[in-house]
Structures are given as structure tokens and as C-alpha cells.
């Protein structure tokens, strides 16, 4: 998308703790960048220091953009809107949409009010109907959406509309407390597995033990992540994703994910297989 538009993408390297360094952002972005995009939790599952990164982006005159690839984290972690980010966008498949061979997906996009009229698409807002009851309507929609459709900034297909409805129903059923409980469950199970790995003194260790994580963490050790996956598979454990082949400045290791779908028996099986290989 960016290459055809003549937009240059510069990648800032993470620090020794697996997080983006604000100074690296300043050096990479300089005063030429239009925006600084930050994923949190990042590829390694590490939660970024959002306030410092937003400040670093704004110092050079760039917009600060947070990308959330695991929306379940928002039940526990404050989003970029709480830390002076201009745009927050991401993937909301976790909100009640079952994965099927990778899809379907549901993207979300939010921004500061000062950028509202530059947003693509239409905004649905809350209002009241003629009886005074709660209702929803299109509160902002560019005329091109309805008149000059060839010049519209976006169009939504039926499938995406269905995904939005499904996620809305799921969130309404879960409620704020339910979403927080789910997020906390993911966090606590991940922390339990990390603690158990450190307790057994395995040669496979947590890559960044001091950095906060959500859902995922990186295991590094005497061999490659690909080798560890194969060895654990021989013990009937589907362990995770090797970082090799994904590009980026990541150590060669195994990315392990823990969610509310992983039972205590699943964690026990993982630990038993890892201890056997150690």
C-alpha cells in the first residue's frame, strides 16, 4: 500500500528489554515522519511504554498511532487514547468471532476528535428515538458515500457488517466486568506458565523476564524455535510459533500464547513435555 503511494516506511529496532526505545523513535522518525505506529502488546507479547512513545512521536511533529492486534488486552490494559495517542486501530476477532482458517476478521478504528472528519467511512453514534428510547444512527457520513460513490473514502461489505453485529452482541453479553475477567484470566494463565518455566531451571528460558506481557511470551534456548516445536510435537504438544521466518530483529525462539481456552491440563502437558526435553 505505501510503496505505490511513495511513502517510506522506517522500522525502529526494539531495545534489550524487547520494547521500543523512545530515543530510537526520535532518531528513526526525526522531523520527517507523518506518523509513528506502535503495536502493543507487540509481536513478542510485550506491553509497550505508550506514554513515552507518544511523547517521542509528537516531539517530531508526527501522529502517534497504536495498533492493537489482540483486542482482549483492552479488558485489562488502557488503550492509546488514555496516553495522548492520536489514532488507535486494530483487530477485534477476539470479540466473539470464531477463527476459521485465519478469518473472518473485524478491524476497528478510533481517533482523537480533532481528526474525526479525516476518518474514512461512516460513524454510528448513540441517540434517542421519538419515544425517548436509546437508539443508534449515522452521526457522521460524508456525502460521497451516498452520492458520488466512486469517490467515497471507504465502503463496507455485508460480511463486515455481520462481524460488527456479532462483536457488538458478544460485548453486550459479556459486559465490562466480563471482558475484564476474560482478560485477567489470559494474563494470569500466561504468568503462571512463565513462572513454572523459570522454576524448573530449563535451558529454555523467558527472553525478556522483566518486561510485562499479555497472552504471549518468547522462549529462547540452546536450539532454534523450529527445533523446539518439532520436539514438543513429538510429545503431542502444539507449542507455538517459531520466530524465524517472520522478519524483524527478533531472537530465534518460540512464541508461546496462552488464552482462556488453555486449561490447567494443557499447561501441565506443556510443562511435562518441556521438562522431558530439558
Per-region residue spans from a language model:
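Active-site C-terminal subdomain of aminotransferase-like
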Residues: 95-200, 206-210
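Glycine- and acidic
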Residues: 10, 34-39, 62, 149-152, ...
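Conserved PLP-enzyme active-site core in the AAT-like
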Residues: 1-135, 222, 226-232, 244-245, ...
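Electropositive phosphate-/nucleotide-binding environments in soluble metabolic enzymes
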Residues: 15, 19, 23, 44-47, ...
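Residue-identity detector for threonine
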Residues: 2, 28, 69, 139-142, ...
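Conserved C-terminal alpha-helix-loop-beta "cap" of PLP-dependent enzymes
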Residues: 177-271
Amino acid at each position: 500500500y505505501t510503496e505505490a503511494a511513495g511513502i517510506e516506511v522506517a522500522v525502529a529496532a526494539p531495545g534489550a528489554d524487547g520494547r521500543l526505545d523512545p530515543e530510537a523513535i526520535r532518531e528513526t522518525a526525526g522531523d520527517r515522519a507523518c506518523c509513528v505506529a506502535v503495536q502493543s502488546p507487540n509481536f513478542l507479547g510485550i506491553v509497550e511504554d505508550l506514554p513515552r512513545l507518544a511523547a517521542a512521536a509528537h516531539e517530531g511533529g508526527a501522529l502517534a498511532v497504536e495498533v492493537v492486534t489482540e483486542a482482549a488486552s483492552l479488558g485489562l490494559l488502557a488503550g492509546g487514547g488514555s496516553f495522548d495517542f492520536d489514532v488507535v486501530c486494530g483487530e477485534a476477532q477476539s470479540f466473539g468471532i470464531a477463527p476459521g482458517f485465519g478469518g473472518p476478521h473485524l478491524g476497528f478504528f478510533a481517533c482523537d476528535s480533532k481528526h474525526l472528519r479525516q476518518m474514512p467511512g461512516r460513524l454510528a453514534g448513540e441517540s434517542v428515538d421519538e419515544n425517548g428510547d436509546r437508539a443508534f444512527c449515522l452521526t457522521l457520513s460524508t456525502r460521497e458515500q451516498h452520492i458520488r460513490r466512486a469517490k467515497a473514502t471507504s465502503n463496507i461489505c455485508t460480511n463486515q457488517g455481520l462481524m460488527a453485529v456479532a462483536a457488538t452482541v458478544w460485548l453486550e453479553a459479556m459486559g465490562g466486568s466480563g471482558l475484564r475477567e476474560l482478560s485477567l484470566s489470559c494474563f494470569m494463565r500466561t504468568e503462571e506458565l512463565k513462572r513454572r518455566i523459570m522454576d524448573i531451571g530449563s535451558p529454555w528460558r523467558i527472553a525478556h523476564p522483566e518486561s510485562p506481557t499479555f497472552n504471549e511470551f518468547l522462549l529462547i534456548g540452546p536450539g532454534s524455535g523450529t527445533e523446539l516445536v518439532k520436539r514438543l510435537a513429538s510429545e503431542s504438544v502444539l507449542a507455538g510459533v517459531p520466530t524465524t521466518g517472520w522478519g524483524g530483529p527478533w531472537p530465534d525462539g518460540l512464541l508461546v500464547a496462552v488464552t482462556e481456552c488453555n486449561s490447567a491440563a494443557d499447561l501441565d502437558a506443556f510443562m511435562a513435555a518441556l521438562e522431558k526435553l530439558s
